[in-house]
């Protein structure tokens, strides 16, 4: 069983024919919906299709809503795009104007107040660079330092400048309400800067009936990196969003930051996603570059919970091939990892709480007995996530009583979710879990399993029991 999970972004390419179904059957664990683009009507169609297909194939594919967040974008050009030449003058304005080769509006209405002369402005992931030379009223006058073509609604980054944009815009709130109504499983919080950003979003979700949605903080700028420890504590997972990060932060720092974040998030027992440009050339080509294949493999060696495809599946020419390639790279890389050694090394960083002690003992027992699988019986998913933290070599079977918990566990490293239905007698649950694993071909007679759970069942965060069981007829 592949341990590293795969997130696929849905878009026009996945709307065609049976592409979405093929993504599911090829290894997609989570469907990402990017709310920086597209309409509610189109996103609802995609969510409905995911729901229908996961029911058809009995696959717990989760839905992740990715917010627009406190980002800055260009507005629109009269001719949709313009080409800027190095050395020319160009103006960004917070006034509402029609874009030309000389001026264009931006979405942040107070940008002229936040920015200063000498600031660098990067457009379209840094492909075009401007230097601020003067600020007059609402107009920001710039000199083009790196020319190129820019088009409608391209992203704008301003490294080193703390912007006064609220973390949650009115659009973000509307998007979250839509996500609650559609029963999404995760929200990816774009441009997370502080733990307070996450707390604000959690409060909004709770106030509107979405407290069971898990929040993934996207780290995309230096402020988020500086506050990474408190952000990890506040959220349920981290996305290393290397696109904007690589614009806001020097490129040579990104691999170092990626490895640092992955290590910290694993130690916290939470999910970590490595994202952006992983197989970017497969937007146009049926095979990735060798550098891209190595990039995916290196993230897996680092222990990432999931790798993510963005434009490759949303708008690329080879979406299904991209998922299959990512799955192949993951499966091959995982065969080379010495999980026992990693487990022994990680013991040095163990939190001495009851749950950690039981989960550590569960994994240690599984190694000692050469167990086929670890079975966690869980109401909230907590037990399974804590086992996943230790990255055991055997399968982790996450037996949950709730469909949403099953889908959320489908993002956790190494966890194979199984729905058991409600039952409050612990040994009945264990027997039901064994039978479900036998039914799905995960276990057979004679296999050794290590079972862990919290007793009494239903009290979240109380993993306190370990049981060894040999599968019988």
Kindly give the residue locations of the regions a language model identified.
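Non-catalytic helical/linker scaffolds that mediate oligomerization, partner binding
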Residues: 1-473
